Amino acid sequence: MGQLIAKLMSIFGNQEHTVIIVGLDNEGKTTILYRFLTNEVVHMCPTIGSNVEEIILPKTHFFMWDIVRPEALSFIWNTYYSNTEFIILVIDSTDRDRLLTTREELYKMLAHEALQDASVLIFANKQDVKDSMRMVEISHFLTLSTIKDHSWHIQGCCALTREGLPARLQWMESQAAAN
């Protein structure tokens, strides 16, 4: 009986998917990861290296790698690309000065062979802050409309309040089911 249940789970649910959470420092990557996991704000020191957590949903679970990107070690991201199905790019919507760097990093990732089939979810974080950039402005600056080879979605959010986060896990789950 146990083997039958295990077989049914392998066919109909409990699929594992690898996710990398990337972005420049202080964008909110770790806060978003732990909001998904615990639904609480976890106050932490800046991440050194990476964090990995498993987010379990009824039919899917995601292994999420929160990867720091120190300027001198940007090449380190490549080591996490193998088997990645989803890229979550976190952007600080208040930081116009580093948006060019974010765009360059995004297109480097999308050009990488190991990520050719990855779906992209962009969180425009800190939407609760006055004068933050809106989705239209960020989409335009990142030239998201030119991305044709990857499924992508941009979502405004506030990691501290969790606004905009839950529905995106559902988007990832539906993307995973479609593939």
Curated annotation (Swiss-Prot):
Keyword Metal-binding: no
Transmembrane segments: none
Keyword field contains Cell cycle: no
Record key words, sorted: GTP-binding, Lipoprotein, Myristate, Nucleotide-binding
One GO term describing the cellular component: trans-Golgi network
Covalent lipid adducts (N-myristoyl glycine), residues: G2
GO biological process: intracellular protein transport; protein localization to Golgi membrane; vesicle-mediated transport
Residue sites binding GTP per the record: 23-30, 66-70, 125-128
Molecular function GO labels: GTP binding; GTPase activity
InterPro entries: P-loop_NTPase, Small_GTP-bd, Small_GTPase_ARF, Small_GTPase_ARF/SAR
PROSITE patterns per record: ARF
SUPFAM superfamilies: P-loop containing nucleoside triphosphate hydrolases
NCBIfam families registered for this protein in UniProt: small_GTP (TIGR00231)
Function: Binds and exchanges GTP and GDP.
Membership in a protein family: Belongs to the small GTPase superfamily. Arf family.
Name of the protein in its database record: Putative ADP-ribosylation factor-like protein 5C
